[in-house]
A protein has these predicted regions:
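Intrinsic low-complexity, intrinsically disordered or marginally ordered coil/linker segments
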Residues: 1-312
């Protein structure tokens, strides 16, 4: 398990309905980028197995098997839809709201939802089985992945099950990329494409881009303060800057992680970084008569009472 970095964001002069921000913090609403990821994995496998083929010959050096079956035999709508999805995938499309809707339409019109496991040929099943064995922990989002047959059919049922957004999902603030999401957390599938682990560290500042244990500790008419944790490191500058631009006004950010002995404060105004400082934590003295005692954090002064805890 990681050390946890404690974060506090204080929004001031919020320019839109507070409820929009509260909904994002709470999570639970339909997650378009998670749906695009799930459907994208299925369409990727459909291409690798030759179930779907593009309308024209294609070349994809990161994973040649994706287009190794050549072009479709005719110009039917399912092939048009798959070709449109493939073009966005190969371009590394960012999963913003508009693109996610386009990708979902491609998935629907490809008719891949009707290709349940029992209808696939043995060669098609074998391709999917081999790739799933390689990526099941990433794609199945579980330490105990489902059998490939059940997992594949669950993808076919995706029209009825839209994944829920996680609390404070930073991928809703700065969109991730379709190809990176298919390559997934551990990567190793698409040559030259980052793993989502590496991408998340670069883009969001932390390896799991959501706010854990999110708690709104104050909410006024146009102000809101939320405490949350992130693994190892604070949420990145670009994310908080984007939040300040999206919701207007100013956002103050305090963070601390006592295991790494660091803390920081930043202020963002309408999408721009106004202040950014970091420092080491300051410590009191441990009780010399108690071998189990641990010194208290005593500074810097600006971090005291501005985070819910000091991480670790």
């Amino acid at each position: 398990m990681p050390n946890w970095c404690a974060n506090r964001l204080m929004f001031n002069d919020i320019s839109q309905d507070n409820n929009v921000l509260k909904t994002w913090i709470a999570g639970g609403q339909p997650s378009l980028h998670r749906r695009a990821r799930k459907e994208g994995i299925q369409l990727f496998l459909a291409g690798c197995a030759g179930i779907l083929r593009p309308l024209t010959e294609q070349c994809y050096p990161p994973f040649p098997q994706l287009v190794a079956h050549g072009m479709a035999a005719d110009n039917r709508p399912s092939g048009q839809a798959y070709s449109a999805w493939l073009a966005m995938f190969m371009a590394g499309a960012e999963l913003n709201v508009e693109t996610c809707h386009k990708l979902h339409q491609c998935w629907q019109e490809s008719l891949i939802c009707h290709a349940r496991w029992a209808t696939l040929s043995e060669p098609e099943q074998q391709v999917i089985r081999q790739l799933y064995q390689q990526k099941s922990f990433d794609w199945g989002d579980s330490f105990r992945p489902a059998p490939v047959e059940a997992w594949w059919d669950s993808l076919c049922d995706g029209e009825n099950i839209t994944p829920a957004a996680e609390p404070m999902d930073f991928r809703d603030v700065l969109p991730t990329r379709l190809d990176i999401e298919v390559n997934a957390f551990n990567g190793g599938l698409l040559t030259g494409i980052p793993s989502s682990y590496d991408h998340y560290l670069t883009r969001y500042g932390c390896k799991w881009p959501v706010g854990y244990e999110a708690n709104i500790c104050f909410a006024g008419e146009n102000t809101l303060t939320v405490d949350f944790d992130t693994p190892w490191s604070p949420v990145g500058e670009d994310v908080v800057a984007a939040l300040s631009k999206q919701y207007g006004g100013e956002v103050d950010h305090w963070f601390a992680e006592q295991g790494g002995n660091y803390c920081g404060y930043a202020r963002y105004v309408s999408g721009e970084t106004d202040v950014y400082i970091t420092d080491e934590l300051e410590w009191g003295e441990a009780d010399p008569d108690d071998e189990d005692s641990f010194p208290d954090v005593t500074g810097p002064e600006w971090i005291i009472n501005n985070v819910a805890h000091f991480g670790g």
